């Protein structure tokens, strides 16, 4: 089931989503980014990073409306990060707004978090587990299940606050439907994976859009009830929030909080390598935990402001809540259909990328992958292609361009706006009898050519096409086109050596002139003769004169 969708028309092939995806679960095909669902951990980083808004979180507002329309009461479990998302709004105000949308009521997910905290405290008190990793974050759970299964024994088999609160609501209001609203994309997947507790998941962005659609404004109200002291678990959406809600009574355990996928991955590697002692680890995929979630409204006030809002809304006590018979949940290994290619295949791909030597592996990351070898593996797995390598494309384009420039029979010269030579090909150097490229590179063009035409093109903005010029200093005739590219601040000259053509034309003109001179003599001599025998030859002589005169005119025209 797709939780992240692509808006194909928006994707511009910038690879930013790959750069930000911690597990590289993105496949590029036909110039479009596609999520590889069985590899994705639903962290939402590609959604946040995409500058073109080409990634979309599945919208479930329609499903929530259907639940309301069914006539069965629908209760909302609202994530404690709502106070960071909706500035100055408490649970009472939000409850009023949600009722206007048709919900039966809204209660805090932090109530379910109370049961989760109690389960974590029991695990620590038992002391049977060397390492305990919190299991509230579904993205962290998925990361471990797919990529670090060796750490599964350390992952607490405890329901998340969302699942626990969904069950609490269904116990309090038998037969009701439940909708969770929070800042997290992966909660949609968790609700589907553990069906029964939560019937629908909305993000804060979805809720905000729905409220605007219905012209419902969330107005601050007096919230004395909402500020009850029984609310320590409202701290959950901040880094160390779980730890701050716990009684840390076992001195044998070290308590630590880790946020951000990369930090979590590093910690998991340390755990698997046996470098970690007895500890309880709170893990959150999002930097700053849930208040840094991908589906928080984009109008963030800043982490300090949001952290303060959560702290001020929280209390130091505990919720009085309904007890659940079973707080455990299964977190099995998730197998992925992913094959690792052999070293020979990787070397072959690197060779095709013009990286036959390790020194050629720049590891620049422009393709989105951290190393060239990682990119080669992705190509072999069908997730990437050669054209995603910027240095490769640049080298290929330059090679192609150089081949064209250096093998064309036309002379090509590129000047800066200061009329200094930036590039000149072999054909142009031959035209101007220049032995070495270094003799002219960076030099003023006035050293080799009259700059008047180049200055004219720059001042008028009008290009010159096929202008015939005699380069007296080189004894060459050229047909020159001069183009001024303002966007790149260059002047380009394309010269065609027409010296051979001019020499041939001069020979033809000379031959024509000689033929005309001979014709004139013939005509003159003929006319003297016809004066003597005009009466005998008559019309025939006149016709001869006309023919010769016409020949002369034709030759003259050819000369012109």
Tell me what each language-model feature is.
Residues 484-529:
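Sensory coupling linkers of modular signal transduction proteins
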Residues 58-351, 370-377:
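Iron-sulfur-associated redox domains of electron-transfer enzymes in respiratory
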Residues 450-500:
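PAS-family sensory/regulatory modules and their coupling/dimerization elements
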Residues 396-430:
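Sensory modules in modular signal-transduction proteins
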